[in-house]
UniProtKB/Swiss-Prot annotation:
<feature type="binding site">
    <location>
        <begin position="122"/>
        <end position="124"/>
    </location>
    <ligand>
        <name>(6S)-5,6,7,8-tetrahydrofolate</name>
    </ligand>
</feature>
<comment type="subunit">
    <text>Homodimer.</text>
</comment>
<dbReference type="GO" id="GO:0035999">
    <property type="term" value="P:tetrahydrofolate interconversion"/>
</dbReference>
<comment type="similarity">
    <text>Belongs to the SHMT family.</text>
</comment>
<feature type="binding site">
    <location>
        <position position="118"/>
    </location>
    <ligand>
        <name>(6S)-5,6,7,8-tetrahydrofolate</name>
    </ligand>
</feature>
<comment type="function">
    <text>Catalyzes the reversible interconversion of serine and glycine with tetrahydrofolate (THF) serving as the one-carbon carrier. This reaction serves as the major source of one-carbon groups required for the biosynthesis of purines, thymidylate, methionine, and other important biomolecules. Also exhibits THF-independent aldolase activity toward beta-hydroxyamino acids, producing glycine and aldehydes, via a retro-aldol mechanism.</text>
</comment>
<comment type="pathway">
    <text>Amino-acid biosynthesis; glycine biosynthesis; glycine from L-serine: step 1/1.</text>
</comment>
<feature type="modified residue" description="N6-(pyridoxal phosphate)lysine">
    <location>
        <position position="226"/>
    </location>
</feature>
<keyword id="KW-0554">One-carbon metabolism</keyword>
<dbReference type="InterPro" id="IPR001085">
    <property type="entry name" value="Ser_HO-MeTrfase"/>
</dbReference>
<dbReference type="Pfam" id="PF00464">
    <property type="entry name" value="SHMT"/>
</dbReference>
<keyword id="KW-0663">Pyridoxal phosphate</keyword>
<dbReference type="InterPro" id="IPR049943">
    <property type="entry name" value="Ser_HO-MeTrfase-like"/>
</dbReference>
<dbReference type="GO" id="GO:0004372">
    <property type="term" value="F:glycine hydroxymethyltransferase activity"/>
</dbReference>
<dbReference type="GO" id="GO:0019264">
    <property type="term" value="P:glycine biosynthetic process from serine"/>
</dbReference>
<dbReference type="GO" id="GO:0030170">
    <property type="term" value="F:pyridoxal phosphate binding"/>
</dbReference>
<dbReference type="InterPro" id="IPR039429">
    <property type="entry name" value="SHMT-like_dom"/>
</dbReference>
Amino acid sequence: MSYAIETFDPEIFQAIENERERQTNHLEMIASENFTIPAVMEAMGSVFTNKYAEGYPHKRYYGGCEYADVVEQLAIDRACELFDCNYANVQPHSGSQANGAVYAALIKAGDKILGMDLSHGGHLTHGSKPSFSGKNYHSFTYGVELDGRINYDRVMEIAKIVQPKIIVCGASAYAREIDFKKFREIADEVGAILFADIAHIAGLVCAGEHPSPFPYADVVTTTTHKTLAGPRGGMIMTNDEDIAKKINSAIFPGLQGGPLVHVIAAKAVGFKHNLSDEWKVYAKQVKANASILADVLIKRGYDVVSGGTDNHLVLVSFLDKEFSGKDADAALGAAGITVNKNTVPGETRSPFVTSGIRIGSPALTSRGMKEIEFEIIANKIADVLDNVNDSELHAKIKEEMKELASNFVIYDKPIY
């Protein structure tokens, strides 16, 4: 049986080729995106895609799972080593699935949860009204102050008033370090479970470039892509055996059926990469590159929320500009620089328009770019923002960025 994609399905083949070309020639600067290594992609495309394996290692509902058990146990063991925890569930299909499982395992419908406001940098699954987390639970929010930072005393005040069952700490657009110890103190004060979502910063945490949520958080979730640069997926971790059992039941049979064994194999490969000395060097460079990006944009007169960054992302506000985040996103895209429009603290526009953009350093750092390239790119971003309607300038910068990108090819041959 041989069905080479190029001849069997030329439409899909062409779409893949076009996307590979786009990723190669454009500068990917969406903070939640990264480039994974070929070994991860090979595992994703392996024969494990054919295998059903409902249950957990050595406790399956299907036969023929002996090798599925091997890869899942490797993924679990490596995850626990990576984050210095006792239990890990590597089956969640996504970060949102992982977060949903935490709620399902530990609280009831209608219980109170306290998470970061979406427009202040939180995530949909932290209690936003359109999300299941805002519909199934009674959600409340905390935010950032005028300086763009979390005021932990204010979070304590809100928690005392709300008396939530779960406090969610973590964000999707917060550029500063999260103080998990202070969140632990707040949770203890009101008798709440502390749930840390480290999806955006996990790759920094495991390299020692951001404080760990352990031992402070009761339960921790993450995606396995983003700063971890693995396959798209989710994971849940804890040091509490009782919570681990509840989490396992919430994932299967609660929210999911058969796990994606090929993805779990890829997660294990990704974790091996994250455990290397090379990874620590990479994570340090991710932060250094983001810092340069923030510094240049500030020098060029742009409002960087919180005045800088401690991690992999930079949030830029256009509340004082006539153009919107949507306008900036489109202009930068035309210049060969891919970012995403993003809400900002004090947002006045709709979520489809926004007053800001979120920019990240992980993907370009994976391509080998360092401070010198990020200084060039940051200035080009500022040039575009200074001339958001100048299509001729955008086209010129696009060619310049394509030339820069050609020196940092991420995949030298197709991986399929």
